[in-house]
Amino acid sequence: AIAAVITFLILFTIFGNALVILAVLTSRSLRAPQNLFLVSLAAADILVATLIIPFSLANELLGYWYFRRTWCEVYLALDVLFCTSSIVHLCAISLDRYWAVSRALQYNSKRTPRRIKCVILTVWLIAAAISLPPLIYKGDQGPQPRGRPQCKLNQEAWYILSSSIGSFFAPCLIMILVYLRIYLIAKRSNRRGPRAKGAPREGEPKQPHPLPAGPSALANSPTLASSLAVTGEANGHSEPPGEKERETPEDPGTLTLPPSWPVLPNSGQGQKEGVCGASPEEEEECGSPAVPASPALACSPPLQQPKGSRVLATLRGQVLLGRGVGTAGGQWWRRRAQLTREKRFTFVLAVVIGVFVLCWFPFFFSYSLGAICPQHCKVPHGLF
């Protein structure tokens, strides 16, 4: 029964982590640099499932080390290497999450694939530095006990304490502190709410930001009110008395573009003047007899529309909306959505890391007791 369960876990680990690697490498939405951590972590878990767990299962079922002594030493070194790499990967991911939340602008510009690969290489070097000493320095090895051979971890106190601190306790402490800090940052940002600087209040409609009324004012004037003229008098035109009384009332918040706005060339007819009504035919094309406005306002000339902008038609003309309608609010909401995704991902990782720590803590705690008090703190073999 134990062999069947462990075999299922081995296959499930290999299949699940292979899907993670395949998804990150093939999906465009998952090709963010930080997802390289997941690829490397999944590779470490696959190596554990293929090179470590099967031999551990055989050792437990047989009760002795069936394979060669040399492979035992390599097996123990690889065991420490892959397990330490997995834990340190989780520590690196937690630090990446923290910097992405606390220093979003500065860190996201530096989060390049090359930097992430350098961090991953550092993770593997740390794991190698912890796992290789038993292969290089074997210490004073007494005679092998008679009977069936055993394959056990290094029992020297200096290695037990150093490997336990480097492989588990130090990364675990870092992860707990980092995720506590991320929680405090998320809580503080939720208290601030949407009333951040430059952000629209809840229930307040987003107002479009029309562009100024002339090419020279596009780069200098921030609002439409400073550059648009609401009546024809802004261009030197006057309306006959009584014309204003016959005009159809409009939304006071709607502004029109003056006739001085440059027009687009008509196909095959050259550039028109900025004043409408040069001929009866043109008046019929762009004007409407239902709204008897002055010649300057009877119809608005075609807009020279910048790329990405939109035109809003009104009774008294056309309003050119800016390229980013509600740019400040839109940026704020995009930033808020990004932070929400960061927090959700951080929460998922915190759950995964919490379960991981609970699974590893009993082993490292009992393993460390053998170095602290080898005579009085012996852990039962079955529990270990």
Swiss-Prot record:
Residue ranges with Polar residues bias: 218-229
Q: Which GO terms describe its molecular function?
A: alpha2-adrenergic receptor activity; epinephrine binding
Topological domain (Extracellular) residues are 63-72, 141-156, 373-381
- GO cellular component terms, A-Z: cell surface; plasma membrane
Protein location: Cell membrane
Site feature Implicated in catechol agonist binding, where: 163, 167
Site (Implicated in ligand binding) residue list: 79
Q: So where does this one cross the membrane?
A: 1-25, 37-62, 73-95, 118-140, 157-180, 349-372, 382-384
One GO biological-process annotation of the entry reads: platelet activation
Q: Where is this region: Disordered?
A: 192-289
Provide the disulphide bond pattern: 72-151
**Pfam families (UniProt xref):** 7tm_1 (PF00001)
Q: Where is the composition biased (Basic and acidic residues)?
A: 240-249
Which InterPro entries does the UniProt record give? ADR_fam, ADRA2B_rcpt, GPCR_Rhodpsn, GPCR_Rhodpsn_7TM
> Topology in the membrane?
Multi-pass membrane protein
Q: What is its main location?
A: membrane
Listed PROSITE patterns: G_PROTEIN_RECEP_F1_1, G_PROTEIN_RECEP_F1_2
The segments annotated as topological domain Cytoplasmic are 26-36, 96-117, 181-348
Q: Which UniProt keywords apply?
A: Cell membrane, Disulfide bond, G-protein coupled receptor, Lipoprotein, Membrane, Palmitate, Receptor, Transducer, Transmembrane, Transmembrane helix
**General function of this protein:** Alpha-2 adrenergic receptors mediate the catecholamine-induced inhibition of adenylate cyclase through the action of G proteins.
Describe its partners and assembly state: Interacts with RAB26. Interacts with PPP1R9B. Interacts with GGA1, GGA2 and GGA3.
Q: Which family does it belong to?
A: Belongs to the G-protein coupled receptor 1 family. Adrenergic receptor subfamily. ADRA2B sub-subfamily.
What is the name attached to this protein's record?
Alpha-2B adrenergic receptor
